């Protein structure tokens, strides 16, 4: 908070007061008294509001700003767990609004003005869908939403300006202040999706400007392990800031990016290519890293003839020399080196096994050994990246994942070795056909 103030920035707390609270449900004190079902709080219970009061008290102590994001997104099953058992079925709009009023009262108690994600109002009116072309809301809902709460329209998955236009129009059914949130798309795995996110942000921000939306921010979520480096999405952050100022000249933005970071924008977005230019936000650099060499659920998704990691690795080499951000490029270059072997290892293993080509299998064992070495290098660089950017909390997940991956590679190597010397008659996993992952 002090650092933000020194840089003339306002640090606004963003909490959850309805769903996405599964972490705290690990403790029986909360799980048994505060939760409706899954990660959704039990609306109407005193213990729930004691918990929320504590959240606001902490935020009031830690933050200078008296604006707060109270969350409330994606509570798809609100009112359908313990609440249903206790009260029977109730109109879920009414449950949501009842809870919102209680949370608003607590916010006001601590001097906060609130903003919240808007999706649940639309989902409850449209069969669970948020992004509907003809989004209409019951008049009583529009009337009952407290007017002092800003509504945040969030949208990370479209590049179509007309889509944003329609959704902003739908939000303007409310008399509330509307805020827009786009995303940096840095939450899909180890590599960013800068080019996709910049394109999406440009369309969205053009729409916001034309539709008089003044407040815009970029979300930088870190789902499922926070593997993507924090600064790997700098092209999105800078581009969004320039778009918001009315500058849509990519050449001009690229010059500014080079001046601020010391890296050519074109070289920086080479980070995206670790996913081999996958469609939209697909993340093969993650799922093929962890795909099992023998079970291969994702093997049918591969274009085996177009691995491309050697080419990407060479592009990333340029960025490794940058003083400030070189560590990002070193980590992802190392991942490319591991994926050069790992990406299609399962496909190659199954193919030579089924041909009963013992000479080729023996040669393949070298790949398993080399892969383990490259994974150890990647682990060390990824750990260095984590310690530079993050608190220790959370890396235990990567110890388990990457440690488990290396153990599985060793195990598969041993199984193949035993087969080659006659200790196994066959390898049943490799005799099964891999089913298509996507509908063909």
Language model segments and positions:
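Short connector loops/turns at beta-strand edges and beta->alpha or beta->beta junctions
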Residues: 26-30, 73-77, 184
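Acidic/aromatic-lined carbohydrate-recognition and catalytic surfaces
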Residues: 1-30
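Short, solvent-exposed turn/loop segments enriched in Gly/Ser/Thr/Pro and often Arg
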Residues: 15-22, 72-75, 120, 220-223
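Active-site groove signature of glycoside hydrolases
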Residues: 17, 33-86
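Short, solvent-exposed loop/turn and secondary-structure capping segments
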Residues: 22-26, 81, 163-164
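Proline-centered flexible-loop/turn and helix-kink motifs
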Residues: 13, 27-31, 35, 64, ...
């Amino acid at each position: 908070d002090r650092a933000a103030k020194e840089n003339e920035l306002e640090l606004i707390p963003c909490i959850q007061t309805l769903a996405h609270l599964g972490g705290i449900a690990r403790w029986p004190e909360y799980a048994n008294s505060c939760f409706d079902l899954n990660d959704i709080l039990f609306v109407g219970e005193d213990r729930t509001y004691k918990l929320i009061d504590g959240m606001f008290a902490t935020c009031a102590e830690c933050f200078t700003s008296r604006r707060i994001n109270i969350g409330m997104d994606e509570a798809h099953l609100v009112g359908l767990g313990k609440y249903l058992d206790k009260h029977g079925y109730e109109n879920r709009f009414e449950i949501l609004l009842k809870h919102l009023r209680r949370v608003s009262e607590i916010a006001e108690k601590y001097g906060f003005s609130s903003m919240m994600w808007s999706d649940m109002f639309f989902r409850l009116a449209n069969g669970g869908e948020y992004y509907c072309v003809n989004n209409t809301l019951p008049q009583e809902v529009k009337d009952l939403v407290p007017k002092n709460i800003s509504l945040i329209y969030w949208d990370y998955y479209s590049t179509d300006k007309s889509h944003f236009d329609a959704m902003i129009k739908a939000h303007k059914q409310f008399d509330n202040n509307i805020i827009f949130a786009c995303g940096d798309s840095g939450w899909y795995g180890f590599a960013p999706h800068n080019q996709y996110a910049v394109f999406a942000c440009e369309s969205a921000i053009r729409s916001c400007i034309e539709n008089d939306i003044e407040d815009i921010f970029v979300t930088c979520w870190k789902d499922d392990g926070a593997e993507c480096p924090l600064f790997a999405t700098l092209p999105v952050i800078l581009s969004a800031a320039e778009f918001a100022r009315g500058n849509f000249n990519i050449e001009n933005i690229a010059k500014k990016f080079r001046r601020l970071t010391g890296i050519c924008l074109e070289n920086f977005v080479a980070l995206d290519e670790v996913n081999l230019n996958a469609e939209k936000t697909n993340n093969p650099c993650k799922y093929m890293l962890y795909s099992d060499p023998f079970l291969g659920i994702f093997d049918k998704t591969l274009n085996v003839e177009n691995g491309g990691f050697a080419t990407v690795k060479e592009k990333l080499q340029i960025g490794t020399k940058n003083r400030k951000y070189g560590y990002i490029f070193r980590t992802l270059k190392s991942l490319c080196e591991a994926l050069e072997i790992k990406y299609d290892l399962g496909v190659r293993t199954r193919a030579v096994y089924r041909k009963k080509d013992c000479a080729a299998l023996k040669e393949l064992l070298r790949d398993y050994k080399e892969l383990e070495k490259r994974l150890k290098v990647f682990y060390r660089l990824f750990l260095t990246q984590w310690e530079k950017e993050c608190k220790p909390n959370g890396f235990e997940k990567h110890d388990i994942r990457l440690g488990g991956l290396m153990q599985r590679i060793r195990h598969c190597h041993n199984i193949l070795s035993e087969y080659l010397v006659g200790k196994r008659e066959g390898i049943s996993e490799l005799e099964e056909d891999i089913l298509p992952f996507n509908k063909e």
